Amino acid sequence: MSLDRVTLVAADCLNPAAALLAIEFSRERCDFADAVLFTDRPVRTAVARVVAVSRFSSRADYSRFMLEGLADHVRSDFVLIVQWDGFVIDPHAWDERFMDYDYVGAPWWYQDGMNVGNGGFSLRSARLLRATRDARLTEVDPEDEMICRRHRPMFEARYGIRFAPEALARRFSFERILPGRSTFGFHGAFNVWRALDGRALGAWLSALTDSVLGGPDVLELAYDAWRGGRPDLALTVLREVVSRVEDCEGASRLLKKPNRTHSWRSKRQPSCTEELGDAWWRPDPIDDVQ
């Protein structure tokens, strides 16, 4: 799949190794105009160009860079934003209509007409990048909500920014809402079991820092994999967590009694598999790394 109008981008000062894997997995499935990793770490890789940035000491720093700094580094018509927990999974799901819009991301749960969408795996036009830079927003975090909800009416009226309709966004990516069909990409560590298998999953887990590995999203990944009929993947995740993270009570308890619902699970939204029961969906996963 040739996407010669799109630059593949990740910005990560915490998990650059995992972000590089997201770039690698995406490049295995599509040819991009360019691939760039923005980080403060000394990274040597042939997977992407590495551009040094000041360290992101908070999520707000990341958001400000995405809103104000990214435009200066992009020469293509579009950028595809990936993160350590979101990347391309099915190039055959690409739809040229995605590029009819300035922003495409997985739909959120909101029912007010402003539910597109998640920024962790998102397609953005160069026009949008210039608009977010020039707007000089005083509130920047989280950047996807600032673009797609808080300031969406302003971006539409002042800059003519076009957001993809929900039906098309569902074909592009998913996060908390399963589409029931293959999508171009996904976001969310809890969904990684749908995208990776075997050595690729092991490489991804190894690339995570201990603090991220022991966090709620990775534990929810194990829970959802178990509920989705892949206890082997759940056990792979949990064993990695227990081997590296001290006093991770949630992982230890789930290893002992995996069929129980535990208090460590995220309370923000229902898990994908819990929401849809047995109607879970999984594309052909990546099972190896180059």
PLM feature segments, named:
Residues M1-S63, G69-V74, R230, A234, ...:
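N-terminal anchoring/stem segment of glycosyltransferases
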Residues M1-V6, T183, G188-Q290:
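Non-catalytic N-terminal targeting/anchoring module and adjacent flexible stem/linker
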Residues L20, V47-A48, I89-A93, R133:
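Short glycine-/acidic-enriched loop or helix-start segments at secondary-structure transitions
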Residues R29-C30, H73-V74, D95-M99, R124:
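Short, conserved loop/helix-junction motifs that constitute active-site signature segments
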Residues V79:
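Short aromatic/hydrophobic "clamp" motif used to bind/position activated sugar donors
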Residues V82-Q83:
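Active-site acidic Asp-centered loop
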Residues F87-V116:
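Conserved donor-nucleotide/metal-binding helix-loop-beta segment in metal-dependent transferases, i.e.
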Residues V116-L233:
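Catalytic core and acceptor-binding pocket of nucleotide-sugar-dependent glycosyltransferases
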